[in-house]
Amino acid sequence: MFNETPVFDYEDIQLIPNKCIINSRSEADTTVTLGKYSFKLPVVPANMQTIIDEDVAEMLAKDGYFYIMHRFDEAGRIPFIKRMHEQGLIASISVGVKEYEYEFVTSLKADAPEFITIDIAHGHAESVIKMIQHIKKELPETFVIAGNVGTPEAVRELENAGADATKVGIGPGKVCITKVKTGFGTGGWQLAALRWCAKAARKPIIADGGIRTHGDIAKSIRFGASMVMIGSLFAGHIESPGKTIEVDGEKFKEYYGSASEYQKGAYKNVEGKKILLPAKGHLKDTLVEMEQDLQSSISYAGGRDITSLKHVDYVIVKNSIWNGDSI
C-alpha cells in the first residue's frame, strides 16, 4: 500500500559513506550493462528535441554512451538507423502509440534497431501494452523500453507485456508542468516513487526526471535505477540542438518539454514549458565530470563499481542538506 511508503525526494536524502577500498577514485568502474551492451555511464540524455539530435546521438554512441533518439522527426528515423548501422553503431530510437507507428515498426524488420523506447507521458496504458507486444512480435531481438510510469502495478504490467526496461517518472522534470496542470505525478517524491517501483521490478528501471545534481545519479542507483535519464543537466551545451538566444550580451539556449506548445506546434494538451539556460561548454566535458563525480560516489560507497551504491545506508534529512547554500 502506498500509505506505508516513505515519501522523499533527492534533496531529502544523504547517503552514508563506507570505508574506501580503492587507492584512487579513478579506479572506480562506472560502466553499466543494458541488454547485450555495456556503456560508460549509467546515464542517458533525455530523448527531447532540445537535448539530442542525430549528431549528438552519433557522438554519444562513438564514445560508448547510451542514447535514445527523440521521436519528433518521424520520417528521419529509418535513415537514422541506417546511418548508425553503416558506422557499426547501435541504433536507439523512440516511437509513439498511434496507429501508423505499428506499420512503421513492421517496416523495421530488414534493419532492426537495437533499442526502441515507447515514449508517452502516461505509460500505464493499454495502448502501450499493445505496442510492446507488437514490437516484440515483429522485432524479437530489439530491447524495448516503455514508459513513463509511476507505480509498481504499471511496472509489472509493462514487464509482463514484454518490456525489457521501464521508465519511471511522471512530471518531475524541470520543464514539465504535469503536476501543476493535472494534479498527478511523481514531482516532489520522484526518488520515493523510484524506490517503490524498483521493489516490484524484475527488469531494469530507468529513472527519468528530477535530477538536479550529479550526486542525484548515485542516489537513483541506490534506490533501484539501472540507468538515469537526465534533461536539464544535458541541455544548453555547444552541441545541444536548442536554439541559441542572446540577452543583454549573454548567451542562452532554449530548453523545452516534449509536451510543451513549442514542441507540439500548438497550445493543446500542454504539460510542458520553455526555459532559457545559460550557454554551457562542450557536452563531453560534462560527461567527464559526471564520470569523475560518480567515481567519487563509488569510493564513498566503499566499492569498486556502481553495484556498491545499491547497498549503502542513508538518512532522510527533509530539505536540509543544502543548509542554506545554493547549488
UniProtKB/Swiss-Prot annotation:
It catalyses: IMP + NH4(+) + NADP(+) = GMP + NADPH + 2 H(+). Its EC number is 1.7.1.7. PROSITE patterns: IMP_DH_GMP_RED. Coiled coil: none annotated. InterPro entries: Aldolase_TIM (IPR013785), GMP_reductase (IPR050139), GuaC_type_2 (IPR005994), IMP_DH/GMP_Rdtase_CS (IPR015875), IMP_DH_GMPRt (IPR001093). Transmembrane segments: none annotated. SUPFAM superfamilies: Inosine monophosphate dehydrogenase (IMPDH). GO terms for molecular function: GMP reductase activity. GO terms for cellular component: cytosol; GMP reductase complex. NADP(+) binds at residues 205-228. Keywords: NADP, Oxidoreductase. Belongs to the IMPDH/GMPR family. GuaC type 2 subfamily. Catalyzes the irreversible NADPH-dependent deamination of GMP to IMP. It functions in the conversion of nucleobase, nucleoside and nucleotide derivatives of G to A nucleotides, and in maintaining the intracellular balance of A and G nucleotides. This is GMP reductase. The lineage of its organism: Bacteria, Bacillati, Bacillota, Bacilli, Lactobacillales. The gene is guaC.
